[in-house]
Every structure is written in structure tokens, then in C-alpha cells.
């Protein structure tokens, strides 16, 4: 068939889908706080403070912060910045973020997303208002206010979620963060309403694990806890990628009966490909 004429078609995206990325990405609203805390870890923060109230949730850190170029990079959907630069500059941490969409998860539970950041002599505030964003159909920019910088305050970033559409319970936030952020990492502390979170400590017989595979190393520890410590509400072994728990797995122990409640521990396998919501692994 002969070509009569050549034309080009423009590929467009409805702005509403930017919001729906966050609304559909996570099953639990508390999971979005995991993303914000892990962003702080990637930014070389040594301290992250999460403040939860009925009116708003704030996640602030003392990490590197962002300059204007960093802010522009932050709001690129699907950015591979953390894949290209997979280690943080100060501590050499293996960065957890991979997909560049986690920040939009905040819109699943809040209509207003305010970001304040400081980096050296630069400071700025960006506001993402869901209603204003959807109403301005042809406007793809976010208001960014350049602020007077106070060097004495140091670098860092704060995210304030307000006009909440979902409630955050402090105990749920603590539980989720204790399960899914790298609390064992050196020089990294996380606080929720002023209370520091610590990684879970297990008592029992410890079995170290180290296995080489063609994809990369697998390491960790299995703990056989006493019968008195058996926990049927928290079954499975944590599988971690880049220091953050992705899921818990029984690894075929479903038929073990009551004994399965005594087997705990964690396995680290940084080479495993994970889904965009970090809840499972990609299986081909």
C-alpha cells in the first residue's frame, strides 16, 4: 500500500491521571509516609520527624534539601535520577527510590501537598493543590515561591499534607514505618510525634544466611523464636530490597501448622525487581 501523506499525532496525558497515580498506587494511606521517609533516607538525612495530627501530617528531615534544579527534577514523573545516581553523595547509601512517582502517592490522602526545602543559600516552597490543579486544565506548572534562606537552619526538606481525606492513626504510622523503612541503617533515626522508632528485636535461635546467585547475593538471618513468642498475627519472613521491606513471605511454610508462627527473620536481595507500589516483586 502506497503512502499518500505523512502526519504526526501528539501523545497527551489527561491531567487527572497525574492525581490518580497517587490515588490508586497504594492500598493503605500510611504507605505514602513510607515513601516520604525513604526519600529523606535517599537524601542523606540523619533524622526524620513525622508529626501526625487530625488536621495535617508533616514529614521533615535534615537531608541535603534541593536547589531549583533539584526541585525541577523532583517533579519529573517517572524520573530515573535515582537509578542513574544509585548512591547518595554523603553516606554512599544505596538509594531506595527507583520510579519517580512516590511523591504523588500523597495525593491519595490529602488534597494539598506543600513542600519546603533548603539547600545552602537556596530556599523555596512549592504547593500542589489538587483542586486547583484539576481546574486549570491547560496549566501544567506548580506555584514555586523562592524564599529568603537562613543558613543557620541548615539543609533539609519538609512535606506538609493538609485537607486530609483519610485519617492517620499514630499506631498505624509507627507499625508501617517500623516494617518498611531502613531503621537499622547507621546515622538514620525516625521519630513519630517525638517518639523514636527502633527496629524489631527478636529473641531466639539465629541462623545466618548468605547465598550467592547469578543475579547477586542473598543474605539475612532466620530466627526460631521460643514457643512463648509465637505470633500468628505477624507471619512470614521479611524480604528487603535496598534496606526496605517489600513483603513478607512464608516460603512454603504454609503447611507447617503452629510451628510457622515461630519462624521470623529477614532476607536481603537488592537485585529483585519490585512493583511500582513496592508491595511485591515482578515475576515473568
Please identify what each model-predicted range represents.
Residues 100, 143-146, 174-176, 221-225, ...:
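Glycine-rich, charged/polar anion/phosphate-binding loops
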Residues 125-127, 139-140, 170-173, 276-281:
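Short, charged, solvent-exposed linker or helix-capping segments at domain edges/interfaces
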Residues 1, 7, 11, 169, ...:
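Charged regulatory segments coupled to nucleotide-binding catalytic modules in large multidomain enzymes
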Amino acid at each position: 500500500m502506497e503512502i499518500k501523506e505523512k502526519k504526526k499525532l501528539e501523545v497527551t496525558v489527561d491531567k487527572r491521571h497525574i492525581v490518580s497515580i497517587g490515588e490508586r498506587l497504594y492500598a493503605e494511606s500510611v504507605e505514602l509516609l513510607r515513601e516520604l521517609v525513604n526519600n529523606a533516607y535517599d537524601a542523606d538525612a540523619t533524622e526524620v520527624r513525622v508529626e501526625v495530627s487530625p488536621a495535617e501530617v508533616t514529614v521533615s528531615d535534615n537531608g541535603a534539601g534541593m536547589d531549583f534544579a533539584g526541585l525541577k527534577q523532583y517533579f519529573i514523573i517517572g524520573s530515573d535520577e535515582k537509578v542513574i545516581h544509585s548512591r547518595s553523595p554523603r553516606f554512599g547509601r544505596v538509594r531506595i527510590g527507583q520510579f519517580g512517582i512516590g511523591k504523588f502517592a500523597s495525593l491519595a490522602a490529602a488534597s494539598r501537598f506543600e513542600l519546603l526545602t533548603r539547600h545552602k543559600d537556596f530556599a523555596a516552597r512549592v504547593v500542589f493543590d489538587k483542586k486547583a490543579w484539576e481546574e486549570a486544565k491547560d496549566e501544567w506548572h506548580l506555584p514555586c515561591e523562592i524564599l529568603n534562606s537562613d543558613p543557620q537552619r541548615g539543609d533539609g526538606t519538609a512535606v506538609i499534607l493538609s485537607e486530609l481525606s483519610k485519617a492517620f492513626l499514630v499506631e498505624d504510622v509507627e507499625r508501617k514505618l517500623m516494617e518498611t523503612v531502613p531503621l537499622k541503617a547507621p546515622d538514620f533515626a525516625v521519630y513519630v510525634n517525638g517518639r523514636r522508632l527502633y527496629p524489631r528485636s527478636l529473641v531466639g535461635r539465629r541462623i545466618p544466611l548468605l547465598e550467592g546467585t547469578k543475579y547477586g547475593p542473598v543474605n539475612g538471618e532466620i530466627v526460631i523464636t521460643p514457643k512463648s513468642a509465637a505470633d500468628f498475627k505477624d507471619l512470614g519472613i521479611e524480604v528487603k530490597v535496598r534496606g526496605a521491606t517489600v513483603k513478607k513471605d512464608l516460603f512454603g511454610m504454609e503447611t507447617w501448622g503452629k510451628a510457622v508462627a515461630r519462624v521470623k527473620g529477614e532476607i536481603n536481595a537488592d537485585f529483585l525487581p519490585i512493583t511500582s507500589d513496592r508491595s511485591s516483586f515482578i515475576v515473568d
